[in-house]
């Protein structure tokens, strides 16, 4: 019995247009990927395909050369690989050149003979002995310097410095080499981590890391000591610690929203530097406009925040919030946010839009979502504004 195939128009015009749009976007992305990755592996045949160079432009056309030929296109430059040609015919062997080494030696005086040669050899051995003695004296001086400062040495270097019966000089060289390696590593660490804690001496690469260290180590220790022991630390150390916080202008995470710097009109004054790269803009190397949080004033470059082009343009149209101040755009609360997902159900988590970075509770959406979607997700505002350019349409379903 014959089956009836329904017409596409009977399914609805909106459904048909949506299917065509998905097909168009898929073909566009497929062609873009094929032009970028060469050679690419054909998923149907399993063959690594290369660019065939059959697509030419009008500017490449030339006059026809053969009768009946309308156009000609320039050929690709082809170069044959060089290979080693084995000459089997004895008559085709390369010419043999005999270099007369004795002639220039005779012209320049040649090698000395008799007692003159012996004197030169004795002088060379004497120079070598002098150099060895100088090296030994230098090693002894370095050894004395190391013994004057024994606290700078590690246990392994002290063990290696113990003279052995077979290789006495080798053991000395190991200890000095280890010290040089440690000095080089220390200089590299000083260069890579310029921010130093004035209490424990720990180093960090950036200022936010140093601020985190102060908060979660020394500040917590001081608060506990104030409750348990009133005379635990001297006053000058605590005052220096608090003075460092004043110079740093750092605010704890729990008090950032309430103690952010505000203008006379009540608006939050944004920071003039990026909190991630501290103004270096290391990812792009180009100047970028900062994006500031409307609640705490923290700023960041779009490249440091890993924002797309759509997201960078969208965050300037509303009061953008950083990840620490993020709240639901529908209910306005920040409970059960994504920063503390441990022990929460998927419905209690904040879902972020991939086009505008707005946050939504999954139970605030209409209809509510039971679990986060796979791939990119766009909110209803971005779907209405961007339409087919939204991330949800580009993602394959």
From Swiss-Prot:
CC per GO annotation: cytoplasm; nBAF complex
Binding site for Zn(2+) 1: 274, 277, 301, 304
Signal sequence coordinates: none
Broad class of where this protein is predominantly found: cytoplasm
SUPFAM superfamilies: beta-beta-alpha zinc fingers, FYVE/PHD zinc finger
Keywords noted in UniProt: Cytoplasm, Isopeptide bond, Metal-binding, Neurogenesis, Nucleus, Repeat, Transcription, Transcription regulation, Ubl conjugation, Zinc, Zinc-finger
Domain of life: Eukaryota
Binding site for Zn(2+) 2: 293, 296, 322
Compartments it resides in: Cytoplasm; Nucleus
Binding of Zn(2+) 3, residues: 328, 331, 361, 364
Molecular function terms, GO-annotated: sequence-specific double-stranded DNA binding; zinc ion binding
Zinc fingers classed as C2H2-type: ranges: 195-218
Stored Pfam families: DPF1-3_N, PHD
Keyword Magnesium listed: no
ZnF (PHD-type) ranges: 271-328, 325-385
Binding residue positions for Zn(2+) 4: 325, 353, 356, 379, 382
Family assignment from sequence similarity: Belongs to the requiem/DPF family.
Complex formation: Component of neuron-specific chromatin remodeling complex (nBAF complex) composed of at least, ARID1A/BAF250A or ARID1B/BAF250B, SMARCD1/BAF60A, SMARCD3/BAF60C, SMARCA2/BRM/BAF190B, SMARCA4/BRG1/BAF190A, SMARCB1/BAF47, SMARCC1/BAF155, SMARCE1/BAF57, SMARCC2/BAF170, DPF1/BAF45B, DPF3/BAF45C, ACTL6B/BAF53B and actin.
Listed name of the protein: Zinc finger protein neuro-d4
Organism: Rattus norvegicus
């Amino acid at each position: 019995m014959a089956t009836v195939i329904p017409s596409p128009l009977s399914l609805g015009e909106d459904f048909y247009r949506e299917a065509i749009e998905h097909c168009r976007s898929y073909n566009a992305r497929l062609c873009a990927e094929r032009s970028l990755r060469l050679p690419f592996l054909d998923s149907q045949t399993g063959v690594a395909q290369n660019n065939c160079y059959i697509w030419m432009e009008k500017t490449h056309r030339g006059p026809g050369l053969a009768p009946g030929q309308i156009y000609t296109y320039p050929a690709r430059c082809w170069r044959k690989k060089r290979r080693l040609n084995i000459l089997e015919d004895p008559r085709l062997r390369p010419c043999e050149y005999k270099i007369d080494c004795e002639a220039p030696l005779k012209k320049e005086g040649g090698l000395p003979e008799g007692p003159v040669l012996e004197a030169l050899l004795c002088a060379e051995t004497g120079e070598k002995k002098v150099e060895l003695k100088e090296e030994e004296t230098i090693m002894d001086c370095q050894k004395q310097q190391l013994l004057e400062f024994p606290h700078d040495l590690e246990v392994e270097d002290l063990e290696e410095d113990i003279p052995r019966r077979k290789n006495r000089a080798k053991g000395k060289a190991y200890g000095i080499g280890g010290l040089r390696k440690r000095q080089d590593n220390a200089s590299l660490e000083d260069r890579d981590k310029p921010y130093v804690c004035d209490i424990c001496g720990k180093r960090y690469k950036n200022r936010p890391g140093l601020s985190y260290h102060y908060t979660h180590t020394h500040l917590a220790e001081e608060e506990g000591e104030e409750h348990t022991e009133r005379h635990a630390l001297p006053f000058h150390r605590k005052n220096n610690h608090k003075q460092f916080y004043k110079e740093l202008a750092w605010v704890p995470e729990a008090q950032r929203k309430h103690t952010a710097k505000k203008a006379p009109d009540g608006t939050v004054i944004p920071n003039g530097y990026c909190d991630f790269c501290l103004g270096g803009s290391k990812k792009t190397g180009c100047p970028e406009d900062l994006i500031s949080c409307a609640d705490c004033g923290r700023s960041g470059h779009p490249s440091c925040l890993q924002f797309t082009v759509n997201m960078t343009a969208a965050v300037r149209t509303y009061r953008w919030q950083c990840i620490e101040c993020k709240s639901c755009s529908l209910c306005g609360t920040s409970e059960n946010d994504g920063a503390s997902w441990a022990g929460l159900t998927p419905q209690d988590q904040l879902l972020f839009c991939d086009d505008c970075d707005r946050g939504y509770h999954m139970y605030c959406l209409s209809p509510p979502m039971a679990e986060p979607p796979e791939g990119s997700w766009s909110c209803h505002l971005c779907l209405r504004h961007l339409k087919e350019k939204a991330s949800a349409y580009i993602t394959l379903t």
